[in-house]
Amino acid sequence: MKKLNKKMVLIVSVLVIQCLGIWTLWGNTALKVNEYKILSDKIPEAFSGFWIAQVADLHNAEFGEDNEMLIELLFQTDPDMIVITGDLIDSRQTDIEIALDFAGKAVQIAPVYYVTGNHEARIPEYAELKMGLTEAGVTVLENQKVQITKDGESITLMGIQDPSFRTDYLFGDAESVSRQAITSLQNKSDGFTVLLSHRPELFDLYVDTGVDLVFSGHAHGGQFRLPFVGGLVAPNQGFFPKYDAGQFVEKNTTMIVSRGVGDSIIPLRINNPPEIVVVELERK
């Protein structure tokens, strides 16, 4: 009987380990789509029902051959605009061809706008990446803004370069660099303003500068998501990050933080599947 019990314990243990392994693998490869709706009386009538898809932190990840799964899911969301919020490549295993192939396919779905992350700031190939993105039809925003026009009305899209291009990644004054970039672009006539910025930890700055909607990433959802707690760790926020994933609202500013689709120094997600974010604008 004791031998039988030991055998059963061993079998159950193996099955549990296998199930956990399958669940973890699935959780790292099963792409999700998460939708949000933004209501504002500043949104022009022409942009009510305007859909924005966000891809964050690709880090050279591939979902299917030539990222066909990611592209197909992005296509199914039927966006009016696609935004890429940094870390399209990974500085530890840089392959700009994966990034450019993805971008070239994404622009066939909708207009694509891109800002850098901290990983782009680390690679010597960034100039080559930027040129390739531009040639593919992607609009690269480096402390720049554009007017998005529809039916005679417009919203303002701003994109700031990751502060790592001008400061030390861990110890530089990212807030002052980003503040200068944002305020240099702002104008009272901008109307409803969307900001692309890689760094969610700067949310107080975005609120202070009065931006209406921010798309961000960088936190990877906190990497390991604990029930009833949230993310465990995120770059530039440390343990139990406040801005790990989801929607954050303060005053008149809303920030959407994507969990991202790829990984970097920690090549594992737990209870934190990769996601595409889709946001619908609606006039209130």
Spell out what each predicted region is.
Residues 80-81, 113, 138-139, 155, ...:
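Short, Asp-centered acidic motifs that coordinate Mg2+ and/or phosphate
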Residues 39-53, 138, 145-159, 249-254, ...:
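Beta-strand-turn-beta hairpins that frame and shape the catalytic cleft
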Residues 104, 199-277:
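Conserved beta-sheet core of the metallophosphoesterase superfamily
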Residues 1-46:
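N-terminal membrane-anchoring alpha-helices
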Residues 18, 22, 34-39, 181-191, ...:
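Extended recognition/assembly regions associated with phosphoester-bond processing machinery
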Residues 131, 135-138, 150-193, 203-204, ...:
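Binuclear metal-dependent hydrolase catalytic cores centered on His/Asp/Glu-rich metal-binding motifs
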